[in-house]
Amino acid sequence: PKGDISRWEKVMKRAALLNKYYPLNSEKCKYENFQRSFEGKPEYVDVINNTVKAIAVREQCIFFGGYANYLYSKYMNKTVKNKFSKHPDFDLLSIHPKETAHRIKEELENSDFKNITIKKHDGFMDLLKSHYEVIVNKDTICFVYEPIACHSYNVIKIKDIRYRIATIDTMLSFYLLFIYLDKPYYNIDRILCMSQFLF
């Protein structure tokens, strides 16, 4: 601030250590890794996507995972753009994550989906609060998180619907946190790929 560079050396040393032990690259990085796989029937895709998006918009959630990357890919070249699919792949920030997860479950059940489960995952210190995983059959379609601070986002209008999409710095801060947490339900290569793509 105000031209003060006294902390730059300390920051640079920390950044060098971070890059040494957690480099922002993955040898297995392919565009297919950006999104979670989906083994459900193809006709389920649009119903799940539309249901999750409608609830997220209605509850003013912020998108920051696979779907957000899918939207950002539209600003990339055609080769990159064509690598993305419409697989149900959502990470949401919600003021009331438990309620949001249960609404997704209820609305999908109203559309005749079966075997929908919600898994609660514990938070970590003051960095990550409890969060909820929505699973349809064997496919994880959505994680819902509670914000731990004010997070910046952009509003993107698509067909008169306003989507709150996390800014790149917000997305990267979550992705890096997920890498360090080393939870079994996070695919590190996938997270590194998404981070590389945004960076």
Outline where the language-model segments fall.
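Active-site nucleotide-donor binding segment shared across nucleotidyl transfer reactions
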Residues: 45-98
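N-terminal regions immediately upstream of nucleotidyltransferase
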Residues: 2-46
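Short, conserved charged micro-motifs
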Residues: 98-105
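General structural signal for secondary-structure boundaries
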Residues: 1-2, 9, 66, 97, ...
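Short linear motifs embedded in intrinsically disordered, charge-biased segments
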Residues: 4, 21-23, 33-34, 86, ...
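Conserved catalytic core of two-metal-ion nucleotidyltransferases
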Residues: 107-152
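Phosphate-handling catalytic interfaces
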Residues: 1, 153-186
